[in-house]
Amino acid sequence: MTNATQHANENLTIHLKVKDYATWRSGYDGREKGRLSAGITNGRVFRNAQDPNDVVILQDVADVAKARAWLGSDHLKTEMQKNGVVGSPNVRFAAVA
């Protein structure tokens, strides 16, 4: 399996709590350009039926190193705080089995 093929099979799952879903969602949607530049695509957002401020995001990743760098950036951390993310998100990379 080539390196490119391996990267095409990577997924990113982020579980987070937010103060207000509508505020957070507006910020999330506004960061699409940043996600694309980090090789993160095809984002699907899910909300807990019992707690609409409990959010899970599932995304495809083309380049794990680029995605990790973007996720760890001070700019993104500031934006997440500004948009109401509570605490630290649970971030997991997984390969399609």
Enumerate the predicted regions with their spans:
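Short S/T/G/P-rich N-terminal loop/turn motif that feeds into the first structured element of a domain
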Residues: M1-E79, N83-A97
